[in-house]
Amino acid sequence: MENILFVYENQLPDNFSENVEKAGITPKVATPGDELSFDKIDAVAYFGENKDNLKTVVEKAVESGVKRAVYVASAICYFNRRNPGQNLEKHPFVKNQTDCENAILAFSDKISVSVAEIPLAYPLPKEIFTIGGVPALKCRNFYLTFDGGYPEIGDESAAESVLSVILNGKNGVIYPLCDKNAKFKSMLNEKYPDVKVYEFPEELWWVLALRAKSSLKKAGLTAKTNIKTLYKKDLYENYFFDDTEVRKALGYK
């Protein structure tokens, strides 16, 4: 297989390397300070810190004659494009992900670039109360969550989906991928079947927002997100998408 620049900024499933090696690709890890060489390797996995680091590594790949690049981005980029009025880029994570995605797509006239957008496991902001990684509040004998949700993807599906983009992705095309769309309440019911779960009324968002702000203040922390927007809108939004056509394009049934 030809040399491939494989770029991702978030942790991928443990079995990802095993899956891509079956396809004849051997991912190598490079950090921003490394001298990169593309003459004897099949792929490079690069942990970029920002769009400038990403541009640097892509430029090196192009200079070395690499013809193909695949970037793994967060599905949040999809929702940022779909809902421009929500201004999701106010959150630094969304801004960074979107900037990096746009930066690598800008090279599509010099190198074949495909993007895989998957729901990635990354730490939720400290401003959000969570239970088992799900936005929720623990009460005496029940859980309170929000009337929202987002797409999910399993480790095996994530590895297979990204591999499909590596093998079959077209230049300049973005592929949003997921297994299913899940609401916070259903995720908690699945994880904690013996605990009752209720959805916190949206009109009382300000109660939890004030509590979150107070908790941060006691911990000596400053909010990195707009808590008002977070609790008034974002946690009650269903960030769902249907990737049926995308999966068909990649060879899935």
Where are these regions (language model features)?
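Amphipathic terminal alpha-helices
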Residues: 2, 17-20, 38, 236-253
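Mid/C-terminal beta-alpha module of Rossmann-like enzyme folds, strongest
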Residues: 161-225, 243, 248
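NAD(P)-dependent short-chain dehydrogenase/reductase
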Residues: 112-157
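Catalytic helix-loop patch of NAD(P)-dependent Rossmann-fold dehydrogenases
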Residues: 80-122, 141-142
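N-terminal Rossmann/SDR dinucleotide-binding element
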Residues: 1-43, 52
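Conserved Rossmann-fold NAD(P)-dependent oxidoreductase catalytic core, especially the SDR/UDP-sugar
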Residues: 43, 56-95, 114
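Active-site beta-alpha turn of Rossmann-fold NAD(P)-dependent dehydrogenases/reductases
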Residues: 8, 48, 70-74, 117-119, ...
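Residue-level signal for the nucleotide or nucleotide-sugar donor/cofactor binding architecture
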Residues: 95, 150-153, 241
